[in-house]
Swiss-Prot record:
PANTHER family found in the cross-reference section: 3-PHENYLPROPIONATE_CINNAMIC ACID DIOXYGENASE SUBUNIT ALPHA, CHOLINE MONOOXYGENASE, CHLOROPLASTIC
Complex and partners: The naphthalene dioxygenase (NDO) multicomponent enzyme system is composed of an electron transfer component and a dioxygenase component (iron sulfur protein (ISP)). The electron transfer component is composed of a ferredoxin reductase (NdoR) and a ferredoxin (NdoA), and the dioxygenase component is formed of a heterohexamer (trimer of heterodimers) of three large alpha subunits (NdoB) and three small beta subunits (NdoC).
Gene name, Swiss-Prot/TrEMBL: ndoB
EC number: 1.14.12.12
Name assigned to this protein: Naphthalene 1,2-dioxygenase system, large oxygenase component
Domain of life from the UniProt record: Bacteria
Domain annotation Rieske: ranges: 39-137
Listed pathway(s): Aromatic compound metabolism; naphthalene degradation
Amino acid sequence: MNYKNKNLVSESGLTQKHLIHGDEELFQRELETIFARNWLFLTHDSLIPSPGDYVTAKMGVDEVIVSRQNDGSIRAFLNVCRHRGKTLVHAEAGNAKGFVCSYHGWGFGANGELQSVPFEKELYGEALDKKCMGLKEVARVESFHGFIYGCFDEEAPSLKDYMGDAGWYLEPMFKHSGGLELIGPPGKVIIKANWKAPAENFTGDAYHVGWTHASSLRSGQSVFSSLAGNAALPPEGAGLQMTSKYGSGMGVLWDGYSGVHSADLVPELMAFGGAKQERLNKEIGEVRARIYRSHLNCTVFPNNSFLTCSGVFKVWHPIDANTTEVWTYAMVEKDMPEDLKRRLVDAVQRTFGPAGFWESDDNDNMETVSQNAKKYQSRDGDLVSNLGFGGDVYGDEVYPGIVGKSAIGETSYRGFYRAYGAHISSSSWAEFEDVSKNWHTELAKTTDR
């Protein structure tokens, strides 16, 4: 396959060949250029608060151990014994000073160093250099306000720079709210879909909500219920979409703090969020304070998505070109009353948990998109994401990134696939940066500040 062929994904992200959702050769290329190169979500501070705490996570198809060190730092290692390649840790989470392989008993410290080998002197003599046999370490581990990401590529930009313009929109909730927590362990389910299908949807697709989720909207009586069955468009000025250089993007639905949740939760959620408004107005200004109380439908490129006010946090772990393991956490504000946290966690399970009704609505879409990508006639067709193209702006006086000032559009789709195509066709971060020099002119007209 010619990965520099612009017909695979157009430079502006306007079109993508359907086969990208089902081609196994391309999937192997993604492991090399997407998952081995970009920042991938690992865990949250709240899940490993103390020295020795660890979780097992995934980076692409590889499993890693993420461990809090004695000095408070966080490191991550491949979950593979260096002796014969066996999986080292099978637990999802725990606290340990080290890890012992159940095959031959080799023991590794929480710092990844090989510390003990049964009968080392008797069997190996001086032939084994333990200093060279530690666990393979993930090159970069950094935090975005408590959310821990890892990257295998030393040449990647810092996590802060990688978040880029998207970070400006996320910080009101992730930082200025007082901080967030993830409630784990995550719910896990396998869907027969390519990882990009849900990732693109969560990057800000408000277009499907009224139709795909019609029955869920009617039964739940959320603040978005008026959209059910495409009975109406969101009113003018109801939201915006944005995207950024490295592919992260989102849709913003103004003042949607109670999210997708049903009427019984709305008064308490609105009261809790509203109590912070005066402080946030003073600290970060009225625009970003409004972003805090608005519903963000976001994907951090490539495979981490969340709905801020709905408390839904997902990672789309690829298994193969047509199979994805979905991890779902509940995301809550640290200072929420414990009873409200509990009720929000329950609501996340009802809506977007492994058997949630909103989740079930989406899965049929994701799976058939991916299944059709393998069929002979349909795989070479072009998928389009041109909704709102030509109306996006770069250089807005208020809102950073490429911005489409409508609740419904495909601005964030285009940014996601522009970055995706640039990575697939590049052999390194340096080449990606070179082909991305004009990323904003490919996606939007530029305004003078």
